[in-house]
């Protein structure tokens, strides 16, 4: 594992207790192979970090977009705090170089696995909060998302509903959504596509658009909204 001093310099955060930072970078595979070690793995920190990320980003969106309704704010927040997004931010910090992994996980490419990187970013957020407090953690998160939020203000950011739906169905149902063209109508130069999205045998939603990609995105948006509403009401 690379020097934690180097990581702290990159973060702009100096830990009073470096053991907290080390735990945030400790994968469960490492603790399984080293049960006598003092530090636990980072799974509980992931839980806390996820909540903190959602809080800090939601608060900033609330302040920056006073005219947007709750549903739209939720869409933007979810589109920002996704596994792929968090993994990209972890890559920028080179978190993979600092992970403590079991031998098997390391050999199988664990340092570049997107789920490991995203989990480590969540855990790192929690570690900063636990060691340095609320404001330092908030500053770290908002600095990391500053460009993303700026792009939203400039109209350069569009939620990737297909990716959001895939993450949701994988997490909750261990299955991938499937898209199918239901029909296409109109002349070749002005065709409208209608696409369905299903999970197994269950039809989730239907969307339409001038291209298949646009229709799939609209179907994914509708399906994501439906599943999110169902999970909140249930």
Regions from the PLM with identified roles:
Residues 1-234:
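Double-stranded RNA-binding/processing signature
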